[in-house]
UniProtKB/Swiss-Prot annotation:
UniProt-listed HAMAP family: Ribosomal_uS7_B
Keywords carried by this UniProt record: Ribonucleoprotein, Ribosomal protein, RNA-binding, rRNA-binding, tRNA-binding
Protein name: Small ribosomal subunit protein uS7
Function: One of the primary rRNA binding proteins, it binds directly to 16S rRNA where it nucleates assembly of the head domain of the 30S subunit. Is located at the subunit interface close to the decoding center, probably blocks exit of the E-site tRNA.
InterPro entries: Ribosomal_uS7, Ribosomal_uS7_bac/org-type, Ribosomal_uS7_CS, Ribosomal_uS7_dom, Ribosomal_uS7_dom_sf
Family per record: Belongs to the universal ribosomal protein uS7 family.
Keyword rRNA-binding: yes
Cellular component GO terms held in the UniProt record: small ribosomal subunit
Assembly and binders: Part of the 30S ribosomal subunit. Contacts proteins S9 and S11.
Keyword tRNA-binding among UniProt keywords: yes
GO molecular function, one term: structural constituent of ribosome
A UniProt-annotated Pfam family: Ribosomal_S7
Biological processes, Gene Ontology terms: translation
C-alpha cells in the first residue's frame, strides 16, 4: 500500500465480441493457466446457449444473472478484547462484481454436466432465475450478515 496516493486500478480492455468490460473480466476469472482463447470459447458458447434458452440477448441475460448473485453485505472478522466478532460490512461495487463472478465460476465447475460451456450456461440460467448454487451462496452470506447485525457497531 503506497503512502502518497491511491493506486489507480488498471483499465481492462473490453472483450472482442460484445465490447463489454464486465464480460472481459469474467473471461479472466474463468481463465486457467493463461489460456484466454479457451476461456473465451467456453464463455461465448455458454452465452449462445443462454440466449437461445432465455430468448433474451446474450449480454442482457449475463448481466441479469450477475445482478442476482452480487452480494450487498458480507461479514469480516474483527478481534475485540480477546474474542472475534463477525462484523457485517457493505461490499464495495468492484468487489461485488468480483465475488459474483467467482461464485458463478465455482458453482459451474462443481456441476456435473458434460462440457464447461454447458455447465456455465446452466449456472447462468439458474442465476438469472434466482436459483442455483451461486445465488444460494449469496443468500448464505446475507443471512450471516443479518445474524451478526448486533455487531455492526464494531465497524471500522
Amino acid at each position: 500500500m503506497p503512502r502518497r496516493r491511491s493506486v489507480e486500478p488498471r483499465k481492462i480492455l473490453p472483450d472482442p465480441k460484445f465490447g463489454s468490460e464486465l464480460l472481459a473480466k469474467f473471461i479472466n476469472v474463468l481463465m486457467v493457466d493463461g489460456k484466454k482463447s479457451t476461456a473465451e470459447s467456453i464463455i461465448y458458447g455458454a452465452l449462445e446457449t443462454l440466449s437461445q434458452r432465455t430468448g433474451k440477448e446474450a449480454l442482457e441475460a449475463f448481466e441479469a444473472a450477475l445482478e442476482n448473485v452480487r452480494p450487498t453485505v458480507e461479514v469480516k472478522s474483527r478481534r475485540v478484547g480477546g474474542s472475534t466478532y463477525q462484523v457485517p460490512v457493505e461490499v464495495r461495487p468492484a468487489r461485488r462484481n468480483a465475488l459474483a463472478m467467482r461464485w458463478i465460476v465455482e458453482a459451474a465447475r462443481k456441476r456435473g454436466d458434460k462440457s464447461m460451456a454447458l455447465r456455465l450456461a446452466n449456472e447462468l440460467s439458474d442465476a438469472a432465475d434466482n436459483k442455483g448454487t451461486a445465488v444460494k451462496k449469496r443468500e448464505d452470506v446475507h443471512r450471516m450478515a443479518e445474524a451478526n447485525k448486533a455487531f455492526a457497531h464494531y465497524r471500522w
